[in-house]
Amino acid sequence: MPLRIGYVREHFSSPLLQYAQADQNKTFTLVECPSGTGQLISRLTNDEIDVAIALTDPLISGIANGSKAYKLVGSYVSTPLNWAVITGTEAKYNSISDLKDTAIGISRQGSGSQTMAYVMALQQGWPSEDLKFKINNDIHGLIKSVNDGSTSAFMWEWFTTKPFVDAKECRFIGSVPTPWPSWLIAARTTTPPDDLRDRASRNVEFIKTHFGYPEEDILAWLKTVGYPDNCLTIETKVITDTLSVLQKAGVVKGEFDVSQFVDTAVVTLV
């Protein structure tokens, strides 16, 4: 039976989509999760997918907060993710500092959009317990929310959001890059390791065709992104540094054994 791989349809998924075209559903099928990492984690937990390519911070915080449904099994993107801070076209907010004590839009509980709001608060010196959130499911709901005033802002990947900004549906007021490599691979703890081992280009035309971005945006993004040479290793520092920031932001609490985050039958900690 082919592996079910959950993913978010963004430009970061281009290598996966290119491989899927070549594979033709022989060894894996793709399951799109438009709401992001929160939805990917939910589907892993509910046995709706076997593997997820998802954001580093929610995957790590999920395990740190007690999830036994999945383990980390590989690296996907080795560079940080640049999270844009976005508000409505006519909203009164013009900088990140204007957002203090306002409601921030997120896609789901435990999503990257929520985790990065905590990181933003940490950088701004705001108490994490003062943050208020409103769930808006996906980028379309988030944009609607900042324009109708029910939220002040939301956070989403810069280049994914740029077409909406170019169309004057919303505005950038800042950005917060992740202080860690941005994407990891996780698998259900019941997924056979051999399947993952066996089934484990920066192509402007491919991204143009599949995502409709202008060539200048694609070239700008390609200068900022890196993919690992070996997906079957994860640097111990990625997990410890991420946990350190998440602890300071109040997302996770306690001390952790790094080996409990990974499936060592599949991936090697280095």
Where are these regions (language model features)?
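Short, low-complexity disordered leader/linker segments with a strong preference
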Residues: 1-2, 270
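Short, glycine-/small- and polar/acidic-enriched structural segments
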Residues: 2-127, 133-134, 152-158, 169-179
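Extracytoplasmic/secreted proteins, especially bacterial periplasmic and envelope-associated proteins
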Residues: 39, 43, 112-119, 141, ...
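Helix N-cap/coil-helix junction residues
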Residues: 67, 126-128, 212-213, 251-252
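Periplasmic-binding protein-like
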Residues: 77-87, 166-191, 259-270
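Pocket-lining segment of extracytoplasmic ligand-binding domains
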Residues: 138-209
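Secondary-structure end/capping motifs
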Residues: 193-251
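C-terminal solvent-exposed extensions
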Residues: 242-270
